[in-house]
Design a protein with these regions (language model features):
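Secretory targeting and sorting signals
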Residues: 1-28
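C-terminal subregion of chymotrypsin/trypsin-like serine protease catalytic domains
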Residues: 2-4, 56-65, 175-176, 180-250
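Extracellular/periplasmic catalytic domains that process cell-envelope and extracellular macromolecules
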Residues: 37-41, 55, 93-97, 122-126, ...
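Catalytic histidine site
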Residues: 38-75, 87-95, 197-199
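Conserved hydrophobic/aromatic beta-strand scaffold that supports enzyme active sites
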Residues: 45, 60-62, 100-104, 145-147, ...
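Short conserved beta-strand and strand-loop elements enriched in small hydrophobics
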Residues: 46, 72-83, 128-135
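Active-site-proximal beta-strand/loop segments in catalytic clefts of secreted hydrolases
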Residues: 49-51, 56-58, 63-67, 79, ...
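Chymotrypsin/trypsin-fold serine protease catalytic domain
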Residues: 96-175, 198-221
């Protein structure tokens, strides 16, 4: 396996449950492999606000709350497994609990991916293994990824008692700045976003998105988009145009 970095930038430490040490700012993931051209999950991973995020519909990015202010601050957006695409975002929304945010694309902008990842609606279980993706915010030319095993589930008072969990990398990887908000996919479903990590040999902490599925649905409904919960994501603009008769009904 080639030695590269994955990246986990962090604005604040996370206080973990009794059996876990409090974690300071994330320090990037090393020893991770670059993704292959046929990695279907990698194509939706983006760089936004100096952190990692995931395009979950044509107009919305799932990311980490601590990377963004809550409001209309614009952020540069890079897409593609070699970060060749450039766009912009318009507004960020914070989940009521957990280190979770949704970032809306700029007006008249939209992703054009063939598909969008399915979101997990159940919390992960200890022992499950998933694939983590994250961008270092400076050096990587190609998106890195790593295998990680779920260990402990806990609730974090720093994020209104939000549901969190820890994972241990199985391939010697560990975090570096830029990975915050990076997705962990378990059985092909987006299960969590990276929140905090402290370095080599220590667990990575993720926000459990299943705890905020209803908030995600309600927030995305602002422009008619719907998350993929097993039936594919819905483009709110296309839905509106179909209702108006400008596009054929599906």
């Amino acid at each position: 396996m080639s030695i590269n970095k994955i990246a986990l930038s962090l604005a604040a430490a996370v206080t973990v449950a009794t059996s876990i040490i409090a974690t300071p700012s994330a320090q990037a993931v090393q020893n991770a492999a670059p993704v292959s051209d046929d990695d279907a999950l990698a194509k939706n991973v983006v760089i936004v606000g100096g952190c990692t995020g995931t395009a979950i519909s044509p107009h919305w990015i799932l990311a980490a709350k601590h990377c963004f202010g809550n409001g209309t601050t614009a952020h540069m957006l890079h897409t593609g497994v070699e970060k060749t695409g450039v766009d912009g975002t318009e507004e960020a929304y914070h989940a009521p609990t957990g280190d979770i945010a949704l970032v809306r694309m700029s007006t008249h902008s939209a992703f054009t991916f063939d598909s969008y990842p399915e979101l997990a609606t159940e919390e992960p279980k200890s022992g499950q293994v998933g694939t983590f993706y994250g961008w270092d915010n400076t050096s990587h030319k190609r998106l890195p990824h790593s295998q990680a095993e779920v260990k402990n589930l806990y609730q974090n008072g720093s994020y209104n008692n939000g549901k969190m969990y820890t994972v241990h990398h199985k391939d010697g990887a560990y975090a570096q700045p830029g990975d915050s908000g990076g997705p962990l996919f378990i059985d092909g479903k987006l299960s969590g976003v990276a929140s905090a990590i402290s370095g080599n040999g220590t667990p990575m902490n993720l926000a459990d998105i299943s705890a905020e599925i209803n908030w995600i649905k309600q927030t995305m409904a602002r422009n008619g988009d719907e998350p993929n919960l097993g039936n594919g994501a819905v483009n709110g603009m296309d839905k509106l145009l179909r209702l108006k008769g400008f596009l054929p009904r599906a």
